A protein has these predicted regions:
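Bacterial N-terminal signal peptides that target proteins for export
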Residues: 1-8
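Exposed beta-sheet edge and beta->alpha loop/turn motif
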Residues: 102-156
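Short solvent-exposed beta->alpha transition segments
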Residues: 56-102, 117
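Short, low-complexity N-terminal intrinsically disordered segments enriched in polar/charged residues
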Residues: 20-68, 77
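Repeat-unit-sized solenoid/scaffold elements
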Residues: 38, 42, 46, 80-86, ...
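Residue-level signal for mature regions of secreted extracellular proteins and peptides
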Residues: 10-13
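N-terminal short leaders/motifs
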Residues: 41-53, 90-109
Length: 156
């Protein structure tokens, strides 16, 4: 009887250890999701500001130079067309995260934006769309305990 109780105690402690191990890995995933959510909630208003002002330096802690260069090109293309974009982020929700090797991730988000296109150099409104939903795919890289955007693409 005593050996049965000892065996049962060992089995229960092993089950508890395995359960705790699974809980901590889920906790790591939740922490990762929160880190990415906070980063995107910080970055996206700065992205909107870059489109409005043409100032990109605030993006540097969050996006790789290649991504900043592609944003710069899009803003230049709008300028050539005589347009300036004023964007306001309404919400961002992470739909999916596929992470690998601790330092890489693909993230899919659902973002809602208010977009107003002005004629360059004036407040004349050329187009406006409020509460525009977008599904966006990001490629992220972790470095120095923070995530950076390597690539951002609107899916729909």
């Amino acid at each position: 009887m005593r050996s049965t109780l000892l065996t049962l105690a060992i089995l229960l402690s092993g089950t508890f250890a395995v359960a705790c191990g699974d809980a901590s890995s889920k906790s790591d995933e939740e922490v990762e999701r929160e880190e990415i959510q906070v980063m995107l909630e910080t970055y996206l208003p700065l992205l909107a500001q870059a489109y409005s002002t043409g100032q990109y330096s605030a993006l540097e802690p969050y996006a790789a130079q290649k991504e900043i260069s592609s944003i710069h090109k899009r803003v230049q293309d709008l300028t050539v067309q005589g347009r300036r974009l004023e964007a306001t982020l309404r919400s961002v929700t992470i739909e999916d995260i596929k992470a690998w090797n601790y330092s890489n991730a693909y993230v899919t988000t659902h973002e809602v934006w208010d977009l107003v296109v002005h004629a360059t150099g004036s407040d004349q409104v050329l187009a406006e769309e409020y509460e525009q939903p977008n599904r966006v795919k990001y490629q992220l890289k972790r470095g120095d305990d923070s995530w950076r955007i390597l690539f951002r693409q609107i899916q729909e």
